[in-house]
């Protein structure tokens, strides 16, 4: 699984 900057950002939600 690759997590991009956006993925990490949305991960907070």
UniProtKB/Swiss-Prot annotation:
Domain of life: Eukaryota
Any one of the GO CC terms: extracellular region
Location relative to the cell: Secreted
List of residues that carry Phenylalanine amide: 13
Tissue distribution of the protein: Expressed by the venom gland.
Main subcellular location: secreted
Residues modified to Pyrrolidone carboxylic acid: 1
The keyword Secreted appears for this protein: yes
Keyword line: Amidation, Pyrrolidone carboxylic acid, Secreted
Family: Belongs to the tachykinin family.
Protein name in the entry: Tachykinin-like peptide-XIV
């Amino acid at each position: 699984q690759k997590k991009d900057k956006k993925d990490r950002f949305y991960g907070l939600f």
